[in-house]
């Protein structure tokens, strides 16, 4: 009897954990903040905008929420002449986090030469960021980072719309 009771409790916990994993995300939001970056050459003032953008189906219903981070260098006279880098890793499984926090972003993980975290843990200025020469958008494909499909009326979205080279081109273009 004790084993059955424990099994029932374990099952109930699993159901609750599954419910905790399903979250409702707003489909169109932004948050903007201002920052400074010390590079090897100069101090760069920049704006960071993170947000989500809806992906629409053929009849105009939102079917996914696409997460992005957008960095723009401040005090640029003609933004139309400034290069824009759009960076994303392939999903599912890996969002743009490694491009963002390991290579081109204005802040990088505090790690040693072999890639192990060093104290104090966290992030530090990236003196090699490309923000001095180009604005950057990091995009998380659907089911990576905070990008998710949006089930409508209890029905799951057709996942074939998001997984594959041609699918990525279709919904990201």
List each language-model region with its residue ranges.
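Conserved acidic catalytic loop of the alpha/beta-hydrolase fold
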Residues: 155, 170-173
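Conformational gate/switch positions in structured elements
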Residues: 12, 42-43, 141
């Amino acid at each position: 009897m004790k084993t059955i009771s424990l099994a029932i409790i374990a099952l109930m916990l699993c159901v609750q954990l599954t419910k905790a994993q399903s979250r409702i995300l707003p489909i169109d939001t932004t948050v903007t903040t201002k920052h400074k970056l010390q590079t090897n050459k100069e101090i760069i003032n920049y704006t960071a905008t993170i947000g989500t953008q809806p992906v629409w189906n053929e009849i105009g219903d939102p079917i996914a929420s696409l997460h992005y981070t957008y960095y723009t260098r401040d005090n640029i006279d003609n933004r139309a002449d400034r290069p824009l880098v759009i960076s994303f890793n392939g999903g599912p499984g890996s969002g743009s986090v490694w491009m963002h926090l390991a290579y081109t972003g204005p802040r990088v993980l505090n790690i040693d030469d072999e890639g192990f975290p060093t104290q104090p843990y966290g992030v530090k200025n990236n003196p090699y960021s490309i923000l001095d020469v180009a604005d950057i958008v990091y995009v998380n494909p659907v089911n990576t980072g905070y990008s998710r499909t949006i089930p409508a009326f209890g029905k799951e979205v057709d996942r074939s719309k998001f997984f594959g080279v041609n699918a990525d081109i279709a919904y990201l273009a």
